[in-house]
Design a protein with these regions (language model features):
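Mid-domain alpha/beta scaffold segments of enzyme catalytic cores
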Residues: 1-257
């Protein structure tokens, strides 16, 4: 029993074998996944994919890279998409100062707007933050993001950010980065994170875990993240226990019965 909380199944790299990718995930024990929107078009695509498969859910929103493209009618379009029963989250949203594909000031403004929208439509948020920890936390606090909660996806921050996220009532989601050779500090944070606040993801097709580095990532590989978590916790927690608990956590966050 596994729940991949962050996939990009609309990505063109799956166009030739999307059904086979999803079938492999199911065969490997992945019970469900959330496919993520990064702008209006990909949010619509996420909803379409979720309608096609009963075990796939969708998240809608605008990634910080893409906020410079937001048009006046987008938020109303998101309000309409949010009415679909398969939409379980708003995101991925946040701040990314590494690439600055959108100007930092505009990122912050749009982040606030999107938190406000998530609160209005009562959806938990999927947060992306890179080299913007303090601003991300400050804005989440100021905009009362805890009212709906959410998850820091693909967590790769430090212990300070982990504590701030947990204090806000958010979950931490760990990806294939956890398996990388140079991720010892992150593994320590994962070990210290309460299991009932832990999620797992692939962020596929990105961030392929060891031992599949160099290949396209896919949801079936989320088992490698669960295995790494079990290894981190040692004999006290089995792979099966990790799978059961993180799946329960995902269903609780996304209000999936």
């Amino acid at each position: 029993m596994l729940f991949d909380t962050h996939v990009h199944l609309d990505d063109a790299r799956y166009n030739d074998d999307r059904d086979a990718v999803i079938a492999r995930a199911r065969e490997s024990g992945v019970e469900a996944f959330v496919t993520i929107g990064c702008d209006l078009a990909t949010s619509g695509a996420a909803v379409e994919i979720a309608e096609r498969y009963p075990f796939v859910y969708a998240s809608i929103g605008v990634h910080p890279h893409e906020v410079k493209h937001i048009q006046d009618d987008w938020y109303n379009e998101f309000r309409c998409l949010a009415k679909n029963k398969n939409v379980v989250a708003y995101g991925e949203i946040g701040l990314d100062y590494h690439y600055n594909h959108s100007a930092p000031k505009e990122q912050r403004e749009r982040f606030r707007e999107q938190i406000q929208l998530a609160r209005e439509i009562k959806l938990p948020m999927i947060i992306h933050t890179r080299e913007a920890q303090e601003d991300t936390v400050s804005i989440l606090r100021e905009e009362k993001a805890s009212d709906v909660g959410g998850v820091f996806h693909c967590f790769s921050g430090d212990a300070w950010l982990a504590k701030q996220a947990l204090d806000l009532g958010f979950y931490l989601s760990f990806s294939g980065i956890l398996t990388f050779h140079n991720s010892t500090p992150l593994r320590e944070i994962a070990k210290a994170t309460p299991l009932d606040r832990t999620l797992i993801e692939t962020d596929c097709p990105y961030l392929t875990p060891v031992p599949y580095r160099g290949k396209r990532n896919e949801p079936s590989y989320v088992s490698r993240v669960a295995q790494q978590l079990a290894s981190i916790h040692g004999p006290t927690l089995s792979f099966e226990q990790i799978g059961v608990q993180t799946t329960e956590n995902a269903k609780r966050l996304f209000r999936i019965s």
